[in-house]
């Protein structure tokens, strides 16, 4: 059974260091959330200020890293939890980016919508 658990930035960054395909750990965050399967950490979400200064309006957060060991449904659980937490904290919008080569199924399952291509055209911006 999958459950949400609190994780520190250090724990989340270590998981990213071990499991993320193309990104390194982050310098800071607003909060991080873990997903555990039978007590074993299987995925993390690191949520912080938007990387784009144009989107950093004080009411928007970004899922800066989401990383899983491949456990089924862990990513969608974390995307949904991150959106709920951001709303509960008073944020009006939460965004993330995904590579065009990724399906986005976990984001759609969590209720996120595609906002279109990002400036670099290899990434797609999604919002909740």
PLM-predicted stretches and their roles:
Residues 1-27:
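Short amphipathic alpha-helix that is part of the acyltransferase structural core
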Residues 6, 30, 48-127:
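Acyl-donor binding region in acyl/amide transferases
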Residues 16, 29-45:
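Conserved beta-hairpin
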Residues 25-26, 35, 85-88:
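Short, conserved, surface-exposed binding loops centered on an aromatic residue
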């Amino acid at each position: 059974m999958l459950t949400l658990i609190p994780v520190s930035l250090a724990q989340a960054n270590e998981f990213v260091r071990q499991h993320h395909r193309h990104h390194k750990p982050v310098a800071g965050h607003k909060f991080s959330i873990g997903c555990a399967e039978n007590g074993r950490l299987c995925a993390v979400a690191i949520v912080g200020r938007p990387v784009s200064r144009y989107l950093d309006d004080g009411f928007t957060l970004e899922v800066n890293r989401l990383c899983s060991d491949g456990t089924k449904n862990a990513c969608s659980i974390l995307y949904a939890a991150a959106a709920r937490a951001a709303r509960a904290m008073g944020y009006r919008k939460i965004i993330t980016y995904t590579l065009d080569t990724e399906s986005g199924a976990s984001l759609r399952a969590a209720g996120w919508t595609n906002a279109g291509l990002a400036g670099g055209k290899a990434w797609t911006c999604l919002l909740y």
